[in-house]
UniProtKB/Swiss-Prot annotation:
It comes from Dechloromonas aromatica (strain RCB). PANTHER family: ELONGATION FACTOR TS, ELONGATION FACTOR TS, MITOCHONDRIAL. Pfam families: EF_TS. Keywords: Cytoplasm, Elongation factor, Protein biosynthesis. InterPro entries: EF-Ts_dimer_sf, Transl_elong_EFTs/EF1B, Transl_elong_EFTs/EF1B_dimer, Transl_elong_Ts_CS, UBA-like_sf. GO terms for molecular function: translation elongation factor activity. This is Elongation factor Ts. The lineage of its organism: Bacteria, Pseudomonadati, Pseudomonadota, Betaproteobacteria, Rhodocyclales. One of its GO terms (cellular component) is cytoplasm. Belongs to the EF-Ts family. The keyword Lipoprotein does not apply. It comes from the Bacteria. The keyword Transferase does not apply. Residues 82-85 are annotated as: Involved in Mg(2+) ion dislocation from EF-Tu. It is found in: Cytoplasm.
Amino acid sequence: MAAITAGMVAELRGKTDAPMMECKKALTEADGDMAKAEEILRVKLGNKASKAAVRIAAEGIVAVSISADGKLGSIIEVNSETDFVAKNDEFIALSNGCAALVANQNPADVAALSALPMGEGTVESTRSALVGKIGENMTIRRFVRFEAKGKLVSYIHGGAKVGVVVDLVGGDEQLGKDLAMHIAASKPKSLDSTGVPAELLETERRVAIEKAREAGKPEAMLEKIAEGTVQKYLKDVTLLGQVFVKAADGKQTIEQLLKEKGASVAGFTLYMVGEGIEKKVDDFAAEVAAQAAAAAAKK
């Protein structure tokens, strides 16, 4: 059997855009024959993986995995091109499986996660096979693993488009759920003011000064006005400063709620699917027609 070198794998990948592991398998099956390996990939993937890999994946789901004792957990975002595929059972199973691997195996990054065993292959080969089967690109975008100081509580909202994990010290399960729901609704940027970048605060300060100046406020008052604006901004974007969404009086902040319950938040992570990804907007009718055509082609 011919030796399969990294250069051969790279060459085949360059010709087909197929995943590295699939290229290596094809070359092995073809005993090193490049043309035959290319044909094997064409038959196996129908060129779907290659074509799909260049398209933007801005839909998808957020998945979480938390241990029974609430001490270990993870949150992960896996993207697809359309919401239709994001609801596919195999896509959901892939996402949940990846979340469990992150929690249990602690991979350093997406590349390390992709190399972990899954089923009869790896995460990457499983993902690639699903891309070939469905004909739509899907990518593991990001994840966070948690080792709780307290107990982890999660919340998934809107068809898994928003996910939250909270590390709650003290309190009970209901408090954790309430906090996670609040975070999903109010979208704080950080736990407290120490987590807000200084440059962001400086931008808010400059904008406030310019607005006050344009409004004709005295120069001597500009700094005081800016400081008030910054403090209001901090209340709006920090979890502890925000008004609790379920506050009976409409005034109780999260910080006050936690003090009342004798609890604290060690940290949290909020994921929103596609956040920061430039999404291509297609005509809805055209998208439905494309999905129907793809389904018909598989019959």
